[in-house]
Amino acid sequence: MSAETFKADYQGATVCPSPNFEERKDGAKPQFLVLHYTGMENAESAERLLCSPEAKVSAHYVVEEDGKVVQLVQEAYRAWHAGESFWRGVTDVNSHSIGIEIVNGGPLLNFPDYPEKQIESVIKLCKSIIKKYSIEKRNVLGHSDIAPHRKSDPGEKFPWENLFKAGIGHFVRPALISGGRFMTNGESGRPVEAYQSMLALYGYGIDITGSFDERTQLVTKAFQRHFRPQKVDGVADVSTIDTLHRLLGTLKSLT
């Protein structure tokens, strides 16, 4: 489709049209909100890439470091931000989501902190989208949640707890890291099967095999980045399992 200008869906956003979008498949509506970091040097380079026809990537919004919000794709259309992904049985996450790219260098710039003003804008934008589409708290996600085998954004420095305190997403206070039993790559048995079942029940794409394989390790890292960021090592320790168990226990109370 052509990159024609349009009226911003979000009040206060600046429009910078990207040609990288299409119709949502089968009339799908947004039910997920996916947050990314750009992983590039600055906003200008990220927006240039997201608007390049050759790149074939995009997002609905970019939030710059100073809090400026730029809309690239209208919310009605399918932006190309999720790629090969999965959440709660959905494999075409692009058709079912709104994507927000948050300007942050990630590993390129040694994982800088997210500025407070930027996070304030992210919160306001998320609230608007969540209200408009009645997005469930459990469906406010990081890219690594839906693609743990290939993505790590928005990273362990992203302040998910701050968003939760503002009414966005699902979160519980992470359990303290201590000693005790743990499961790691190469182990197998019923405890591993039970752990995989809990991850799958929450929404992650994982096969319940009873074997702690590379996929299980990657999903564990994704879970830790979002919900137990103090230590991201892919080991299912007591803290990780307890945090996951308490998240599942609060699902019924979510609105």
Predicted segments, located by residue:
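Active-site-adjacent loop/helix surface patches within enzyme catalytic domains
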Residues: 2-138
